[in-house]
Design a protein with these regions (language model features):
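Secretory targeting signals
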Residues: 16, 21-82, 106-179, 220-246
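Alpha-helix N-cap/helix-start motif at helix boundaries, enriched for small hydrophobics
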Residues: 104-106, 259
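Helix-capping/transition residues at the boundaries of transmembrane alpha-helices
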Residues: 10, 84, 95-97, 173, ...
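Junction motif at the cytosolic side of a transmembrane helix
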Residues: 242-266
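Transmembrane helix segments
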Residues: 30-37, 183-219
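Short, membrane-interfacial amphipathic segments enriched in basic
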Residues: 1-5, 146-149, 265
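N-terminal Sec/SRP start-transfer signal
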Residues: 1-16
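Transmembrane helix boundary and interhelical loop/hinge segments in multi-pass membrane proteins
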Residues: 79-103, 110, 266
Length: 266
């Protein structure tokens, strides 16, 4: 697909690679900070579930998973800004000249972006995991549970569900970018939505908030760590997965309809 290949070329730019680099460095730092707090004997209600999970097969993903909020934010910024930039920088019309099929163009861009986000996530988790394993072994802490077959299966479940979460967040970012057509507005609204509205809704309507997109997406990887660490899907994993897929489908359909009917003046 022409649009897909064209988008892949953009990932060689330092500005794009910088986002992936920040994701890796920040997540590794948070993971090591969490590891240090656990192994240094620090206590507190927030640390107790992490300390209890630490020696188990889910211990490694519990530690590196503490950087998930940052991973989501960076992935959302990368996708949203990349799509919205086509309007802000006035390049969308030129792209449509080379690829007249609007939906093929949008699909190609999103496939490339999701691939890049997935690769960035894989590198982030691998590097963070390697750092924590090396740090643990240097202190004489057993990592046998983490590297056992059951531990590896837990890692793969976490990675697979984290990919689903980031795909959902990327599609949300696509929708916001298509609606706003501005980098500043798209990134601002996307981050604001992730940080504020669903939390406010949960205060007044807790049961309903459990089905909102960001929460449902977060429940997927949250289901692979101990319940005390979470967030565990209160509606059950299967229901959360089905609703997440429905949200993703809705984002794709609305984005496609809006993009198809937009007047392109850029």
């Amino acid at each position: 697909m022409r649009a897909f290949r064209s988008e892949l070329l953009k990932f060689r730019r330092w500005s794009v690679l910088a986002g992936s680099g920040v994701m890796i460095a920040a997540t590794a730092f948070i993971a090591y900070l969490t590891f240090h707090q656990i192994t240094s004997g620090a206590t507190g209600p927030e640390l107790t579930p992490l300390i209890q999970a630490f020696p188990t097969t889910q211990g490694l993903i519990t530690v590196i998973g503490q950087g998930r909020s940052l991973i989501i934010a960076i992935a959302l910024i990368m996708v949203t800004s990349n799509i919205a930039a086509e309007w802000s920088q006035g390049t969308l019309r030129n792209l449509l000249v080379r690829e007249p099929g609007r939906l093929r163009l949008l699909a190609g861009k999103m496939l490339a972006l999701v691939l890049f986000v997935t690769i960035s996530l894989a590198l982030t988790l691998l590097i963070s995991a390697a750092l924590i394993i090396v740090a643990a072994q240097s202190q004489g802490i057993s990592t046998a549970a983490w590297t056992s077959s059951e531990g590896m299966r837990a890692d793969l479940r976490f990675f697979g569900n984290e990919v689903l979460c980031l795909v959902g967040m990327s599609l949300l970012g696509m929708l916001i970018a298509v609606l706003t057509r501005s980098i500043g507005a798209a990134v601002g609204i996307a981050l604001a939505y992730v940080l504020v509205p669903e939390g406010l809704i949960a205060v007044v309507w807790r049961d309903g908030a459990e089905w909102l997109p960001v929460r449902v997406f977060n429940y997927l990887p949250g289901s692979t760590v101990p319940a005390a660490v979470g967030p565990t899907p209160p509606q059950g994993y299967t229901a959360a997965l089905l609703v997440a897929l429905l949200w993703m489908t809705g984002f794709v359909v609305v984005s496609a309809v809006v993009f198809w009917h937009q007047d392109i003046n850029a």
